[in-house]
Amino acid sequence: MKWISVKDRLPENEVDVIICAQMRYYKGGTIPVVSTAFHTDGKMNTEESGYNWDLGNVDMEYDEEVDAYIVPEGWWESVRYGEEFSAVDDFVTHWMPLPQPPKGE
């Protein structure tokens, strides 16, 4: 698998991928960080989403037509053994699909 630049294309909504982000640190520089995350395009509403967006720290616009909130565009780091996720506040530069799990186990 190869890294894909976010300038070339983005993954589909809510598909878990591996990301590379430039994490800021206290001395003003950045370091590359690799993590799992998913992207949202800012067009999907909470009723279409597979996640529970009942987060007090995410500012969402309400859409009266569909009686749901619009999930903001962005990257969201996900935790695999829980229902938690949080915004990736650093600059994501690249992503790649997750590998397939091992076979025959």
Positions of predicted regions on the chain:
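Secondary-structure transition motif
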Residues: 1-105
